[in-house]
Amino acid sequence: MKFSVIIPFANAEATLPTCLDSVVAAADRLAAARPACGAEIICVNGGSRDRSAALVAARAAHDGRLVVRAEAPREAGAGAARNRGMDLATGDYLVFVDADDTIAPEALVSLADATADIVTFLPPQGTFDLTRPEGRRATFSPLVGNLLAWNAAYRRAAVAGLRFPNLCNHEDLVWTCGMYARAKTLVGGVRPWYRYDAHVAGSAANSHSGRRVAAAWAATSRMWRAVRPAFAGNGVRLRAVMLRKLAMHLVLHVLAEVPRALAARRGARRGGRP
């Protein structure tokens, strides 16, 4: 078993060292516990203007076994960086880690026996055959709209050809909906391995603009298009569940952006006065 840990980064010099430390620790733990397994760490520069790229280069000089440096198109966003990372990946499973987050030391060891297309710590707990209607019914509502790039591991062979869209936010929701729609097997409710920091200033979750509002709306419509063809005849109340998901997504992730966007616009206008 080999893992490809993909870390997109841009202007993350404050958090990237801690992130890398956690991933390297998980890779070392894997090598010690499961000598037949391995990991590669693919750090993709999404257009940093700070010292992030230099930090990765310094780490690569001391640990060339684990760190691969690559460039994504400048200002193309996290989706393009993840796409570039997938192009370079050679592992059996893909694990995505944001540069302002960390993973637990036992993260990769806990995934070393994975065989499913998707392995997530989200509920429901168990192993599900997604080629059967009961598998889709049990997992659709809890996962669609909640499954993100970082809260699951994905079998690389099942990912083939699936790309993150060019959106400034919520691009991973579109990708995970597409992945869920094509997956044949899923394991849920495993022990959490990811440590998400929602409070890091400048992180994607804390960056707001009018452009993000438009991107969030675009993501909701793409999510619908991604999952709809896969569920005909599966007994899933697709329209009711998806509309509820989209409404929640709209309220929580789109309308919540509007006051911030308006405040930013008012501030820009005041700042532009003579």
Task: Tell what function each PLM region has.
Residues 72-89:
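Glycine-rich, basic loop-to-helix element that forms the pyrophosphate-binding segment
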